[in-house]
Amino acid sequence: MTALYPAVEPAPAARPARPRSGGWLWTVPSVRWAAAALALFLTGLAAQLLGAPQAVVWTLYLACYVVGGWEPAWVGVRALRNRTLDVDLLMIVAAIGAATIGQVFDGALLIVIFATSGALEDVATTRTERSVRGLLDLAPEHATLLGDGSQRVVAAADLRPGDVIVVRPGERISADGTVIGGASEVDQSSITGEPLPAAKDVGDDVFAGTVNGSGALRVEVTREPSQTVVARIVAMVTEASATKATTQLFIEKIEQRYSAGVVVATLALLTVPLMFGADLRSTLLRAMTFMIVASPCAVVLATMPPLLSAIANASRHGVLVKSAVAMERLADTDVVVLDKTGTLTAGEPVISRVTVLIDGADVLGMAAAAEQFSEHPLGRAIVAAARGRVVPEAGDFTALPGRGVRARVAGHVVEVVSPAAYAGENAAVREHCAAIENDGGTAVVVLEDGLPVGVIGLADRLRPDAPAAVMQLAQLTKHPPMLLTGDNRRAAGRLAEEAGIADVHAELLPDGKAAAVQKLQRDNTHVLVVGDGVNDAPAMAAAHTSIAMGRAGADLTVQTADVVTIRDELATVPAVIALARRARRVVIANLVMAGAAITTLVLWDLFGQLPLPLGVAGHEGSTILVALNGLRLLSNRAWISPGATPT
């Protein structure tokens, strides 16, 4: 017998660990430019205080202008070419205006604070990206490939589905796959956020980037390197970061008109007093101050940093929010609709009984052959129960959403359907189905060429965290969750009672689920649908927003859903809703903070004497505070651990 992991040549040097210090900050270009501008400003200030010649002082301050202002100026000019008015350009014009009246110090201060504010924005964005992209560094670059009784070290990027790799104790797993040998416990916290290691045995799935425990494993690769869970997490969050929230789109829509209004008001503040003989210097100074403090920099930053930080935080805990719009919509949730199998239950049903109606019929074998391409948990349970026996090949496979499956097996049309989809009058079939359902199980009828040959009973178990999750959802939404299922009324009612759900709608086809969701939403109720099967996709598409239980979820469901959970816990649903609501509160707080700062500074400038340096500090300071406030949602404290009470 071949050892699980015989001696093997040492792996090439691994990639260097990413530094944990703040050294990465210097990789952000805007940080370097802001630091250089600050250095020039401080040097100019020192020269001014020491009585250096004016030419030297001006040279240093103007150099600060160039270093700190060239990039926003270029961005503003390009925007102007596209007939849009960028806030950055207003800041540069104000700084130049200050220099023209001899206030080069104030203009340089504006440039430094503005450059620092922009650098902090970029740091916020980069930190959000790094918090997600850092997951890619968890996956090792090399793997130990097993083949023909020997082992060799290969690049993890060269692994393909079907390859078998060896994972030693303490090593990181280099690919997504299924355990085919050995047993261990795996630390999956980097992917799913689960705090405790998960036991892994033959048949269990493992993910790239997770850490093997004390046992050795043989793993059959099941996904291409670009399609691993960790790679898809990064891809999804990157795509989400490129989207814009509804609030942000509205802000950007009015920003152009508002900015144009600021320019018009600035020109009016400059020209009207001059027409009545006002002093040029003081009038220009007031107008420039107005342009600075009225600019909507903080308002523009109020929305996206909190939402993107929340998306990054959720991804670290095994929940992928596909867009900023989805994060906003999660916060709107009024009612949560749950599927049963694979959502409220563990999605791992087992065969409880097999009844043969025709002597000699291989009921389980026929059903397993027809179900071998099915993604439904009941189908997978039937296939798993037939493991170890010879199952014939099936062709012409057709999924019948909400009803069952059909396939051609050994020249016969075999169907595995729900009792509701069985149109026959066989009394024995009805009797056996009723007995299974009375016990709280789920029955399926096996047909061969239209004739019933057997009945299979399956039983599923409630997720351990389901009752607590249902209670949390009711507390969050102020409305008890609803259960929509295609299963029989007895089984659905029994399970719903265990979970604490009173509103149960059973024996629904996919279009029936969608119709129920649409009915709920007619009175402007925002419905969140949580499901995992193909038959949940229509209801998800009809809902305000949707979550797919992605670990066992069907591909169509995962594609349709706005949110995908990798962590196999129903408690992540109230947790991500609570995070979305916290993000919304931060957005509102940011908008109030930004609006209050702009209003206060504008009124002070119009009806008082607002010094330019104070206006600059107040305006840019509020912008920085808004950006930093959004970054708070990157903290693990912002995520409510499953089991905690959401607010």
UniProtKB/Swiss-Prot annotation:
Induction details: By both Co(2+) and superoxide stress.
InterPro entries linked to this entry: ATPase_P-typ_cyto_dom_N, ATPase_P-typ_P_site, ATPase_P-typ_TM_dom_sf, ATPase_P-typ_transduc_dom_A_sf, Cation_Transport_ATPase, HAD-like_sf, HAD_sf, P-typ_ATPase_IB
Any single Pfam family the record assigns to this protein: Hydrolase
Chief location category: membrane
Keyword set, alphabetical order: ATP-binding, Cell membrane, Cobalt, Magnesium, Membrane, Metal-binding, Nickel, Nucleotide-binding, Phosphoprotein, Translocase, Transmembrane, Transmembrane helix
Transmembrane segments: 33-53, 55-75, 94-114, 260-280, 291-311, 587-607
Catalytic residues (UniProt): D339
EC assignment: 7.2.2.-
Biological role stated in the UniProt entry: Involved in heavy metal homeostasis. Probably exports nickel and cobalt ions out of the cell.
Protein name: Probable cobalt/nickel-exporting P-type ATPase
Species per Swiss-Prot/TrEMBL record: Mycolicibacterium smegmatis (strain ATCC 700084 / mc(2)155)
Gene designation per UniProt: ctpD
